[in-house]
Swiss-Prot record:
Residues 178-189 have a biased composition (Gly residues). Component of the IFT complex B, the core composed of IFT25, IFT27, IFT46, IFT52, IFT74, IFT81 and IFT88 as well as associated subunits IFT20, IFT57, IFT80 and IFT172. Interacts with IFT27; the interaction is direct. It comes from the Eukaryota. It comes from Chlamydomonas reinhardtii. Keywords: Calcium, Cell projection, Cilium, Cytoplasm, Cytoskeleton, Flagellum, Metal-binding. GO terms for biological process: intraciliary transport. This is Intraflagellar transport protein 25. The keyword Mitochondrion does not apply. Residues 167-177 have a biased composition (Low complexity). Changing D30A: Does not affect interaction with IFT27. The lineage of its organism: Eukaryota, Viridiplantae, Chlorophyta, core chlorophytes, Chlorophyceae. Belongs to the IFT25 family. Ca(2+) binds at N27, D30, K32, T35, N127. The gene is IFT25.
Length: 189
């Protein structure tokens, strides 16, 4: 299935609460595990992802480091001014290993807001975001009256080995800094 968060598929970060020119929010959408957006040391932090059009979303995946609590909200309108919660989750502390969160959802969205509510450390990173789904067919998702749609969480997985960490390894080898030894998420994203 198509990953609608990728830049080449129309995904665009239209707002980020913080930015470092060395680690811009666009890094989350480039398809690479060793590039990332980094927070500036305070929480909460958030970013809004605009999809090319309003689509049915079936899976949201994040690859991050040092995120303790994450919430995702959706908006299916042309103007991103009213969001509804999709899910909120607490992530395990994986040390210098990346956190992979996979959530099966059944929603319709044009915008997704990712809110990093708390971190395990002073800084946190989001290395990749994936939004999988299909064209908006006008129905069959978003439970009536629920606002949340439906969601099923798959267990969080850590990944990493020797090497640096994205939150502490800014001067490390860029090919090794984020994933503690490389990628390996091609099947997931």
């Amino acid at each position: 299935m198509k990953d609608y968060a990728r830049e080449e598929n129309g995904g665009l970060v239209v707002m980020a609460s913080c930015s470092d020119e060395r680690f811009p929010p666009e890094n989350m959408l480039d398809g690479k595990d060793n590039t990332f957006w980094v927070t500036t040391g305070m929480f909460p932090q958030e970013f809004v992802l605009r999809l090319e059009s309003c689509i049915r979303v079936s899976k949201i995946t994040t690859l991050s480091l040092n995120v303790r609590k994450l919430a995702v909200e959706k908006c299916d309108q042309d103007k991103p001014d009213q969001f509804e919660k999709v899910f909120e989750v607490e992530l395990a502390n994986r040390g210098d290993r990346l956190q992979t969160e996979v959530h099966q959802v059944n929603i319709r969205a044009k915008y997704l807001k990712f809110i990093l509510l708390q971190g395990h450390g002073e800084f946190a990173t989001v290395n990749r975001v994936s939004v999988v789904g299909g064209d908006d067919d006008g129905g069959g998702y978003d439970e009536p009256g629920g606002g949340y749609g439906s969601m099923q969480r798959q267990p969080s997985m850590g990944y990493g080995g020797g090497g640096g960490s994205a939150a502490t390894g800014f001067a490390a080898d860029p090919g090794n800094a984020a994933a503690g030894g490389g990628g390996g998420f091609e099947d997931e994203f």
